[in-house]
Regions:
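Cross-family signature of deubiquitinases and ubiquitin-like deconjugating cysteine proteases
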Residues: 1-8, 12, 37, 47, ...
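Short acidic, Gly/Ser-rich segments with clustered Asp/Glu that frequently serve as metal-coordination loops
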Residues: 41-49
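Detector for Asparagine
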Residues: 6, 10, 19-22, 26, ...
Length: 155
């Protein structure tokens, strides 16, 4: 795991997600969620099960990390439970780079037909921001005057 500056710092989707309201505490005053992460996996194509690297930002502190091992990224999330990990189009792509299909199948889920809204495993709530912001990242970025980054071909 390495610290990496400005990986996702300017992402409009990530800033918008952090502003989504949630119930912040249980009846006894303890936090329901201690941390909110936004993550993204980069791959050599459309195979989410073989990512090159993953990057995440902790929204409360703006700390950023890059992981070459997705098991390390998952352990990082699990070390901050209870937490929420958001990815844009995560339920159709990114989640499969972090969890295997058996874990996805066996975990607690909030579903709408075949659509996964939330998947919970080991205290981490994996959520898909595409259900809140139903645009591709390229159009979402453009709507707020930004550009979506592209992974260099040399990776």
């Amino acid at each position: 795991m390495t610290k990496f500056d400005n990986v996702m710092h300017n992402s409009a989707a990530h800033r918008i997600i952090f502003n989504v309201p949630n119930k912040s505490s249980n009846r006894d005053g303890t936090p329901k969620v201690k941390a909110h992460f936004v993550y993204d996996l980069e791959t050599r194509g459309l195979n989410a099960t073989d990512p090159i690297f993953g990057a995440c930002i902790k929204m409360e502190t703006n700390e950023e990390w890059v992981f070459s091992c997705m098991k390390s990224m998952r352990k990082h999330f699990e070390a901050h439970t209870p937490c929420v990990a958001w990815a844009h189009n995560g339920s159709k792509f990114d989640i499969f780079g972090i969890l295997n299909k058996e874990e996805c199948y066996e975990s607690k889920k909030i579903l709408g037909g075949t659509v996964i809204y939330e998947l919970e495993l080991n205290g981490v709530l994996y959520r898909d921001s595409k259900h809140l912001l139903n645009l591709p990242l390229s159009k979402l970025a453009k709507s707020v005057g930004m550009e979506k980054g592209i992974t260099p071909k040399g990776f």
